[in-house]
Amino acid sequence: MPKMKTKSAAKKRFKITATGKVVAAAAGKRHGMIKRTNKFIRDARGTMVLAEADGKKVVKNYLPNGL
């Protein structure tokens, strides 16, 4: 049976660290920033580590061959 293909959309959105954690950009920065606190805007600038359960789902279903 052939290898499962990596999903291109997931390839652009997630990175797998050397320790196996899945990192993604923080959500909530598309619009409506006027009512957000400065702390929220600063924190959303960077990346976040997905919860372990969510990370496993991403790797299993979308990034089977890693990156």
UniProtKB/Swiss-Prot annotation:
GO terms for molecular function: structural constituent of ribosome. Keywords: Ribonucleoprotein, Ribosomal protein. It holds the Pfam family Ribosomal_L35p. The keyword GTP-binding does not apply. GO terms for biological process: translation. GO terms for cellular component: cytosolic large ribosomal subunit. InterPro entries: Ribosomal_bL35, Ribosomal_bL35-like, Ribosomal_bL35_CS, Ribosomal_bL35_sf. Belongs to the bacterial ribosomal protein bL35 family. HAMAP family: Ribosomal_bL35. This is Large ribosomal subunit protein bL35. It comes from Agrobacterium fabrum (strain C58 / ATCC 33970) (Agrobacterium tumefaciens (strain C58)).
